[in-house]
Amino acid sequence: MAKEIKFSEEARRAMLRGVDKLADAVKVTLGPKGRNVVLEKKFGSPLITNDGVTIAKEIELEDPFENMGAKLVAEVASKTNDIAGDGTTTATVLAQAMIREGLKNVAAGANPMGIRRGIEKAVAVAVEELKAISKPIKGKESIAQVAAISAADEEVGQLIAEAMERVGNDGVITLEESKGFTTELDVVEGMQFDRGYVSPYMITDTEKMEAVLENPYILITDKKVSNIQELLPVLEQVVQQGRPLLIIAEDVEGEALATLVVNKLRGTFNAVAVKAPGFGDRRKAMLEDIAILTGGEVISEELGRELKSTTVASLGRASKVVVTKETTTIVEGAGDSERIKARINQIRAQLEETTSEFDREKLQERLAKLAGGVAVIKVGAATETELKERKLRIEDALNSTRAAVEEGIVAGGGTALMNVYSKVAAIEAEGDEATGVKIVLRAIEEPVRQIAQNAGLEGSIIVERLKNEKAGIGFNAATGEWVDMIEEGIVDPTKVTRSALQNAASVAAMVLTTEAVVADKPEENKGGANPGMPDMGGMM
């Protein structure tokens, strides 16, 4: 396919048009008085959102050169979302400001490489200063504030704070769509995995359709159990102890299953069998997790262990096990706390090394099950459109809160960036490098300016006053008052602000140093009909 090439100023101008189109659509959502954007969907109702990255991903421009510019800024939003989970609109606003200011200077004859060095120097200083003014997040109230600011909803803030308090910082918090109108929190204590009983005859509570085992022994094996003779020695020992038994195996079938069910129905012996969670290597790892949590051992032929020679000493224990049709929950496993801690650290080390998003998610789940528990926020709304929008906002708030726990918080509403202004302005640089520093200075004013404009105020007046205010004092666009931002609970996670600035600078530097842009040449339409076709006027 033929290509079209644009060079230097013409190329950069075309990309800037794309940058502006995307950024202008995204930045209207910034701040407490930001507006929504409606996205057309091929199927179903349109999506209403104020999430920067969701809007950015939807935008495709007709002109291929403009589209490249738009896609680069969409990359800023996407990268910030991947690292920090929020702050995508701020990142887009910063990138647009840096690109626009930078291109003005390049057009006036400045050297792009010099500007790039200046931008990198300024951003490094700004990031260091942000880390220096960052405050660690303490207590439920602070967590609730961060979440409430991100979701623009205090009720959501309280829910997320409660979820984090209940499952701990390593716990998993997931979002589900609720059947009702209200948004609620459901917390699963202990370790839960998605496998239920193999036979409904094993249930102990017919009303709830679940099997509840108090103080049971837990047999953990990766084998398929079908021969009852293999199980008999350990079953006899458990019966003598007068306690119930949970069997976690690849499968329990045939004679073994029939014997367990018959004994349960006769009231001789209470046992519940469930299939092992996961598949392949992940199954082995999860069985090992369960064994460590309950103080048992995995009975595996790979390790030279046989079922028929198993004793009670190899079984795990827990204070309670609840098995439903689809899930098994082990509460208060009797494992050694030091071994559990070592296992958690091992999973953390694997988390740091993995590059696969899927593996990361599964490791995070395993970590949560060992360390804390699982909280489910069930999102409710009156209509499907509202539900989608609300779910997106809560997802952002959740990510924002995790980022705050990780790296602390700074004053929100763009104030933190303005607080590092003087440090960046004090950088000693000359020539084009100094121009790069000035570009960053102009860009870090932009979030405050945009928040004020979205609230219907003159941005420049707010920016100038903020430069003269003492650190931490900022403009609350929701009320129109000047307040101590952190005291008022208007905060941003340091990680979000830092990532937005770094990613914006990275893409801006790429655009400024672009000298040629290559795109596919649009094919000219040579007419739809075949020129050799006869006239069809006489056809009915």
UniProtKB/Swiss-Prot annotation:
Pfam families per the UniProt record, alphabetical: Cpn60_TCP1 (PF00118)
UniProt entry keywords in alphabetical sequence: ATP-binding, Chaperone, Cytoplasm, Isomerase, Nucleotide-binding
Main location: cytoplasm
Gene3D superfamilies the record matches: GroEL, GroEL-like equatorial domain, TCP-1-like chaperonin intermediate domain
Domain of life: Bacteria
Catalytic reaction(s) noted: ATP + H2O + a folded polypeptide = ADP + phosphate + an unfolded polypeptide
PROSITE patterns documented for this protein: CHAPERONINS_CPN60
GO cellular component terms, A-Z: cytoplasm
Matches recorded under PANTHER family: 60 KDA HEAT SHOCK PROTEIN, MITOCHONDRIAL
Oligomer and partners: Forms a cylinder of 14 subunits composed of two heptameric rings stacked back-to-back. Interacts with the co-chaperonin GroES.
Name of the molecule in the record: Chaperonin GroEL
Annotated organism of origin: Geobacillus thermodenitrificans (strain NG80-2)
